[in-house]
Amino acid sequence: MASLDRVKVLVLGDSGVGKSSLVHLLCQNQVLGNPSWTVGCSVDVRVHDYKEGTPEEKTYYIELWDVGGSVGSASSVKSTRAVFYNSVNGIIFVHDLTNKKSSQNLRRWSLEALNRDLVPTGVLVTNGDYDQEQFADNQIPLLVIGTKLDQIHETKRHEVLTRTAFLAEDFNPEEINLDCTNPRYLAAGSSNAVKLSRFFDKVIEKRYFLREGNQIPGFPDRKRFGAGTLKSLHYD
């Protein structure tokens, strides 16, 4: 198989929100039958056609790094986790629509991943502790995905989605809400699939066509993975 250029996308969020199920769905187009807790980091690869259907179309590997752990972990754990944040080209923040705390904690995940973790360990960030303008100069493409949409009754969905609207205001990304146990939410041609493709296109553009400001500051560039198979890699 010919070597393909690749980009690295972090998948961050609290344990139990469905990150592993999401990554499996994105990379294998299948529902994950028996999801388990991620220890350390699990990496899977998605094949993406950049600018599909245009003269500029080109195939890339999207490395999705599912980072385990809790945002309230001890400093030593967070320090170890930081190694996974090297040379990142994009971030997908994942939260559970049925768990308000998991949505609020994305603010702390963003601070940690963007190397601006100024909040004491174990303290949940509230609006009073958090400065939205910290992200005004962020150049890393971001996407927010809410999971377990199927567990919210139709009559409650508007209320829940309004409650999590601050995520889009804080990070200024597009937002996708879905059920990881139902592939139809990412069916070709759907609005979610279009948003996802647009996000990956932006990540690729930042990495290969806009060379400035396309990686998390404070982390040196590391060697890229060599060409290989689509086999999942696990870091424990």
Curated annotation (Swiss-Prot):
> Quick one: a GO cellular component term?
endomembrane system
Q: Which residues bind GTP?
A: G16, V17, G18, K19, S20, S21, K148, L149, D150, D179, C180
Q: Name the Gene Ontology biological process terms.
A: B cell differentiation; intracellular protein transport; natural killer cell differentiation; protein stabilization; regulation of protein lipidation; regulation of Ras protein signal transduction; T cell differentiation in thymus
Cite the residue spans of the region called Small GTPase-like.
Answer: 1-236
Specify the superkingdom.
Eukaryota
Q: What does this protein do?
A: Required for KRAS signaling regulation and modulation of cell proliferation. Regulator of KRAS prenylation, and probably prenylation of other small GTPases. Required for lymphocyte development and function. Not required for myeloid cell development.
Database matches in PANTHER family: DRAB5-RELATED
Q: What is this protein called?
A: Rab-like protein 3
